[in-house]
């Protein structure tokens, strides 16, 4: 087993064990939401790290450095806005993600070109790809 595959498996296991980091007192007031904010209060049990409090995001929860930020498939995620940007992608180590601002017509062109070049498109399902290729 290669080192890369081992690290990808380790990354997946670490992600499964990683707790969901929620903002302090998120359950008291729906207005503040659950998105993570570091606790700064003088008497905050969460900041101190009391065992019966929610987990605080720290360096120890990070994944392996070599595979950090990669797509679960192991490919590097590249944002694409047009067909020209597809040409610069290396299909062996990179995959494309079509930007949200791209319309349907250009999206179809990008999917067709990506299929020709053998590039994986992350945010288009297999059914949509087949539909786009048949047009």
Curated annotation (Swiss-Prot):
Signal peptide: none annotated. The keyword Ribonucleoprotein applies. One of its GO terms (cellular component) is cytosolic large ribosomal subunit. It comes from the Archaea. Keywords: Ribonucleoprotein, Ribosomal protein. Belongs to the eukaryotic ribosomal protein eL32 family. This is Large ribosomal subunit protein eL32. It comes from Methanococcus maripaludis (strain C7 / ATCC BAA-1331). The lineage of its organism: Archaea, Methanobacteriati, Methanobacteriota, Methanomada group, Methanococci.
